[in-house]
Amino acid sequence: AAPQVCPALPGQSSTMSSCTAESGATGLSLAVTDNGGTASSKADNYAGPAAIAVGPKASVTMTGIKPGLAIGIAGPGATVTVDGKNGPTCVGGTSFAGDFQTLKGCWKP
């Protein structure tokens, strides 16, 4: 099956069966899934989070609350969370996150 892409420009939202994206008046968000992953991205206040989940039980939840870009990528069985307040978390399978809101990241090979 083809990847699902949920983009949201300022003031917009987008939803498909495995992804959601929502942006406030000053946010940009993107969620992309394939092969059983789930992803959500929510942005405001000049934040630009991107969530990419590929593979069975891959999950990424991104929240942009401060100015800056953030990315979270999860492979099969991995869970990535970026909340914009604390450092990102990467658990389970192979995953990566980088967050310019907190200047922190995580990596799980």
Residues covered by each model-derived region:
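Detector for repetitive beta-architecture
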Residues: 18, 26-28, 36-38, 48-50, ...
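Long terminal segments
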Residues: 1-16, 59-109
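Feature marks extracellular polysaccharide-active and adherence modules
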Residues: 32-34, 44, 52-54, 63, ...
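Short, solvent-exposed secondary-structure boundary motifs
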Residues: 6-14, 29-34, 50-53
